[in-house]
Design a protein with these regions (language model features):
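P-loop NTP-binding/switch modules centered on Walker-like glycine-rich loops
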Residues: 43, 48, 184, 188-192, ...
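ABC ATPase NBD coupling module
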Residues: 69, 81-104, 122, 130, ...
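Conserved ABC ATPase "signature" region
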Residues: 76, 138-157, 266-267
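Q-loop/switch helix immediately C-terminal to the Walker
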Residues: 109, 116-129
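Conserved ABC ATPase signature
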Residues: 161-166, 170
Length: 339
């Protein structure tokens, strides 16, 4: 714990590195990742499977199990009270106290949060009592209010239910309510709406956005879906092979992407292609973390790659406020691309 600071971002991640030791070698799942998230800000962390986005979230939460380990970097959390915690220096017990209290996580599968043999009221009141000095009756009232906030009808009656008595969308709402219970400074959401239909997904996204704005809770939303980020987030970081390759405001990154990988993702979206025109695609496959090419990890799939791309590009700030890891920034817009 360090001195109080009132103007700092809620979260500062700097030079984060997470490795997994395997029989085939060492895979760096998170490689020199840096970003900040302000109070009440929603940041999208985007990338395809294996990009390192979920591992970044688990690293912040202190949930990396062997053979994985965080080997470098700084993770600082500054609460509403202005006190800064260096999460990497905390003991296992101290991190346990932080989770569910100052930081919370919403998982893709709500049953990773919910115990199938306990009623919802039992699980929610225990989550409050573990971190706050209140009576059981007060904790239960807080649970009821949290269910109401996430749009669950008849919250008093639903407290009496078991998880299997809820639909998938309602279970995810309960998981979100549990994450919000203790008014955390930071929530990390790992693709929590992926398995839900579009209508339910839209409702939950709107509710989460409103709740974060009202409470001042910072949110990292991990997803592979650019359309979700477009409607939810303020800023976005795009990850590829364990590294952030581009970050900036949602409008900047989605409308005028500068990294060839971001450009390829957006240009290949069906909504940008007229009917009857073949979809664009990014050639090749995502490289194995055990056999990354030298220099830029994207260079073997990139149409703009030259000899200089065999060197490792740094994540550098641009004049427009975004950051980019590329020697050859794209200048055209995605809608100008041809198949």
């Amino acid at each position: 714990m360090t001195m109080p600071a009132t103007s700092k971002p809620t979260l500062i991640v700097e030079g984060l590195k997470t490795e997994f030791t395997t029989r085939g070698g060492v895979a760096r799942a998170v490689d020199d990742v840096s970003f900040t998230v302000g109070r009440g800000e929603i940041m999208g962390l985007v990338g395809e499977s294996g990009s390192g986005k979920s591992m970044t979230g688990y690293s912040i939460m202190g949930l990396i199990d062997p053979p994985g380990r965080v080997v470098g970097g700084r993770i600082e959390l500054t609460g509403r009270d202005g006190v800064t915690h260096d999460l990497r220096t905390l003991s296992a017990g101290q991190m346990r106290d932080m989770r569910g209290n100052r930081i919370a996580m919403i998982f893709q599968d709500p049953m990773m949060t919910l115990n199938p043999v306990l009623r919802v009221d039992t699980q929610m009141t225990e989550a409050v009592l573990a971190h706050q000095r209140v009576s059981r009756q007060q904790a239960r009232e807080m649970a009821r209010e949290a269910l109401a906030k996430v749009g669950i009808p008849s919250p008093e009656a639903r407290l009496q239910a078991y998880p299997h008595q809820f639909s998938g969308g309602m279970r995810q709402r309960v998981a979100i309510a549990i994450a919000l219970l203790n008014k955390p400074d930071l929530i990390i959401a790992d693709e929590p709406t992926t398995a839900l239909d579009v209508t339910i997904q839209g409702q939950i996204l709107a509710e989460v956005q409103t709740l974060c704005r009202e409470s001042g809770t910072a949110l990292i939303w991990i997803t592979h879906d650019l359309s979700v980020v477009a409607g939810l987030a303020d800023r976005v970081c795009v990850m590829y092979a364990g590294r952030i390759v581009e970050q900036g405001s949602v409008q900047q990154v989605l409308e005028t992407p500068r990294h060839p990988y971001t450009f390829g993702l957006i240009a290949s979206a069906p909504s940008r292609n007229p009917r009857g025109v073949p979809l664009r695609q990014i050639p090749g496959m995502t490289p194995s973390l055990l056999a990354l090419p030298s220099g830029c990890a994207f260079r073997e799939r990139c149409a703009f790659a030259t000899e200089v791309c065999k060197q490792t590009p740094l994540l550098e700030s641009l004049d427009d406020g975004r950051a980019l890891r590329c020697f050859h920034p794209v200048t055209q817009r995605p809608e100008e691309a041809t198949a």
